[in-house]
A protein has these predicted regions:
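AMP-binding/adenylate-forming
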Residues: 70-77, 91-154
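Conserved pre-ATP/AMP-binding loop-to-beta segment of ANL
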Residues: 8-12, 40-57, 88-91
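Conserved AMP-binding A3 loop
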Residues: 51-80, 87
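Hydrophobic alpha-helical segments in the ANL/AMP-binding
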Residues: 10-24, 82-83, 101-114
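Conserved C-terminal "lid"/linker of ANL adenylate-forming enzymes
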Residues: 294-295, 306-308, 320-360
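AMP-binding/adenylate-forming core of the ANL superfamily
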Residues: 221-245, 249-250, 256, 310
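AMP-binding/adenylate-forming catalytic core of the ANL superfamily
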Residues: 247-328
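Gly/Ser/Thr-rich phosphate-binding loop
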Residues: 157-213
Length: 360
């Protein structure tokens, strides 16, 4: 089958591509966006593929993105399982780039649902105003959107001050948040005010989220193998076999999956182990912290924590060295107005690492 490429900034073209993919006319690859009308150089793609609906690049937050082939059967299973869990198909508001799995799913599921998605310009930085404007254009049926935690934080802060923003969020039947561990203060606060925040866990290799609020889709099995999360089911990417052992740490508690963080984000400092994802979760609970990313800094004396955050200059991060462990004392700390992010909306860990190393 021919592989057709569409740039991410051509969202209508990408939406039409999904229709062709579902009709089994072509396979699709959504490339990074054009810059000044010039398409990015894309190397290594085949002209044709077999048993493939979409080739999707992973976010590449820690390095070079991987290209992952997904079959139409896997994508259809994921779309139907998601709709079943959410209470039915509906209209989607696109707030994420379409060349990554979460944004691509919005388009794919819109075609499956036979609904017209409302399309934000995801090539521009996310703003509450643009989101609310998009939400106001949605129909009266079931409403969904998919966000990353940083976007949800901005909406949560705005909803505290602006009744109209809050009312627009209440109109969504579900707001999915995924891509990384969420800020649980935001999730719990919005839920307490009647907004249905669904915490999604998955990755490109699983056609996106396959666990909602700790519960796997029907037909999907999630277990832990030596602490690593293992997923099996009909939505796995081509070539993975019957199960996929992720690089994420987790545990099953009362029948629900709790994601603890990435296995490659555990440092050893002074003989003490520290999960950077756990550090971030606890640091986000500190008063005055809006957004935060932690990375490992390595020297001849071992590893330590480096932190870049958005928030008050008065935040006391030293609290964490007593409440978590001595390893949680940051070696480097930078306060910024905006976290460096990839086009996927995830933190740019490589850039953040460079900033912190340059500050030492």
């Amino acid at each position: 089958m021919q592989l057709k490429t569409v740039p991410a900034n051509d969202v209508f073209g990408a939406l039409n591509l999904m229709t062709e993919v579902i009709d089994r006319k072509v396979a699709g690859f959504i490339s990074p966006a054009e810059v000044n009308g010039i398409a990015p150089e894309v190397k290594g793609l085949p002209e044709s593929v077999t048993n493939t609906a979409l080739i999707i690049e992973s976010s590449g937050s820690t390095g070079v993105p991987k290209r992952i082939a997904l079959s139409l059967e896997a994508m259809l299973f994921s779309a139907q399982a998601s709709a079943s869990r959410l209470g039915g198909h509906g209209q989607w508001l696109l707030a994420l780039p379409v060349n990554f799995i979460a944004g691509a799913n919005v388009l794919f599921r819109s075609v499956i649902a036979d609904t017209q998605p409302v399309l934000m310009n995801t090539q521009l930085p996310f703003t509450v105003e643009a989101f609310v404007r998009g939400a106001s254009l949605m129909s009266d049926g079931r409403r969904y959107t998919s966000l990353v935690p940083a976007q949800l934080t901005k909406l949560a802060q705005a909803a505290e001050q602006d009744a109209f923003v809050f009312s627009m969020l209440r109109k969504f039947d579900a707001i999915l948040v995924g891509g990384q561990l969420p800020n649980w203060d935001d999730v719990l606060e919005l839920r307490s005010r009647g907004i249905n925040i669904v915490v999604s866990y998955g990755m490109t290799e699983t056609c996106g989220g396959c666990v909602y609020d700790g519960v796997p889709f029907d037909g999907v099995s999630v277990t832990t193998d030596s602490g690593l999360i293992e997923i099996s089911g009909p939505l796995l990417a081509n070539g993975l076999g019957e199960s996929f052992v992720t690089n994420d740490l987790g545990e099953i508690v009362d029948g629900k999956l709790e994601v603890l963080g990435r296995a490659d984000r555990v440092i050893v400092s002074g003989g003490l182990k520290l999960s950077l994802d756990h550090f971030e979760k606890r640091a986000l609970e500190l008063p005055g912290v809006d957004e935060l990313t932690a990375v490992a800094l390595t020297s001849e004396f071992g590893q330590s924590v480096g932190v870049v955050y958005v928030g008050s200059p008065e935040v006391n991060f030293l609290e964490l060295s007593t409440s978590i462990s001595k390893a949680a004392k940051p070696k480097a700390l930078l306060r910024v107005s905006e976290l460096p992010k990839l086009s996927s909306g995830k933190p740019d860990l490589v850039r953040i690492q460079q900033m912190l190393e340059a500050s030492l």
